[in-house]
């Protein structure tokens, strides 16, 4: 009996409810209004009175985790069952039924089922997917329901569309899955064997085929080792045979098909045909056959006969010899037969493997575990001592080379010049390849003491010419002193079997005395091209190597302080420069003959000051002295005192801008351009000036300079152009301070 609807007796069940939408029960199908589904819930998703909604998926017990949909929880999970089917056959002459094996796949995410039949070779049945994936209904009278996971178990039967499948086993994942959802899994059941396939297998085992085919699978080996080649260095010693010699070979073993090719290393000018292939690529038999096989004698299989007909759509055929009568068994070289020190038989030739490349070593180490890859020594035997050929002495007719050629060949031939050297050292463009030296005749005759010569050495053919510049009213004709020819070294016999030695280019350098056909010449200087050539080829001219010269000076490091004081005393203007003669005299007193004259020239050329800088500096200082003399300005000590006062750190240097400000404030009688030019000459890399050196150079009373000479309107001869009389000194001024830093590592105080 229901309670009356009085206050306190009725309960509102919709309190806290937020979902009140109505389900759509009607829709259109082919433009016809109809009831879409009768399984949709009522208002708010609650079922109607008496309505039972069938679940879309199997009902699994909920765990303690999050309640996720089945298509997420069981994604990529498949249950696999092994089943078989007994199928009746129409032709019962051999058997009454067939056993067909299937794989049943159940997808728990949506309860779909798929049935596949594994392929059996020569079964005569259509195999593959038997039932595609979808939900399968239960057999009548429950056709309104679908198969779920609880309908599957080992030892049970399932009916799909009238066909009964007997499940006899499942995989480990399926067995574990069923146990987790509470299903007791039965043990596996023995599956019956197909009687028809059993009969066929027994027949095949007792029948020998008339056309037996031998399966030879080489694809795997080809794909695994394609492009991988073993390389061995070999030697075929054929010196024991007549006109035989030693042959250097390279053996390539192709791992993809076990073939071998051999190439020959032909030495230069061997006289052999330019055919590098010694053995074409093929399989190499271990045992050399006694004779060459005839065509068709070596085949993979023997063919008994062939048959064919002109009937259309009928293929020709042939029969193999299954007993393999007359087959030649050959054993070929494999990679396991090749190793260092092994001698292989290459069609009757004994080839020694004495070395291999790095890939071959790594291959044998990884596959066979070989660690020792010591190469085999195969040096040729020492040749017999060569009999020295003796030639008759020079007879005095013609040149020594022509006389020697007459003794070598039966038919006299001219002497062959070194054409390669001639082409490389011949003059072309701005390169003359001629070394010119300024020399003086060494003699006791007073008349010849002042004679000067130009000695030219031609690098193309090692010839020498001597020229004497013509001077007027000297009493000497001058001109060509020695025509171009090769000059022999003194002290050699004239009539001898060996060729004479001649003066070489490496024996000429500044300071050396050369004997030219009995005349002694002392080399005083050289032109710019010669000095540059000698400095570029220090391996042939060690006296032109600056590093070697500085190493000799470093041996006198104990005199470095004294040497610095001597240079400072010689540099009265504090310009860190001295003239060449002063520089040479100071170094000569220090080394006491340890340095050659060529080394002095090399050092002077490296540390020389450009002539434009020196002349510009002297010109500016002379111009400033002239201004000071006109204005009678002598107050230089005041400038030095002011600079000392400004120099708080006592470094003897001040910034350029401070010295310029001091000069302008003290009314120094110099124009702005001249002052800027002088400051730039004394400025260092840090924009600072040694104020003592600067004002000492400007002091025209203590450090006077020659007065400016008026410009000459006569045309003067340029000293840089080679006129046969080179400059007696290599440089006018030398930067001695840079030299001291490089040679002894001295720093400025």
From Swiss-Prot:
Subcellular location: Cytoplasm, Cytoskeleton, Cilium axoneme; Cytoplasm, Cytoskeleton, Flagellum axoneme
SUPFAM superfamilies: EF-hand
Subunit-structure text: Microtubule inner protein component of sperm flagellar doublet microtubules.
Name listed for the protein in its UniProt record: EF-hand domain-containing family member C2
All residue ranges annotated as the EF-hand domain in the record: 558-593
Predominant subcellular localization, coarse grouping: cytoplasm
Origin species: Homo sapiens (Human)
Organ and tissue specificity: Expressed in airway epithelial cells.
GO biological processes: cellular response to leukemia inhibitory factor; flagellated sperm motility; regulation of neuron projection development
Protein role: Microtubule inner protein (MIP) part of the dynein-decorated doublet microtubules (DMTs) in cilia axoneme, which is required for motile cilia beating.
Bridged cysteine pairs (disulfide): none
GO molecular function term, any single one: calcium ion binding
Ranges for domain DM10: 75-182, 226-368, 431-538
A GO CC annotation given for this chain: axonemal A tubule inner sheath
Entry keyword set: Cell projection, Cilium, Cytoplasm, Cytoskeleton, Flagellum, Repeat
InterPro entries linked: DM10_dom, EF-hand-dom_pair, EF_hand_dom, EFHC1/EFHC2/EFHB
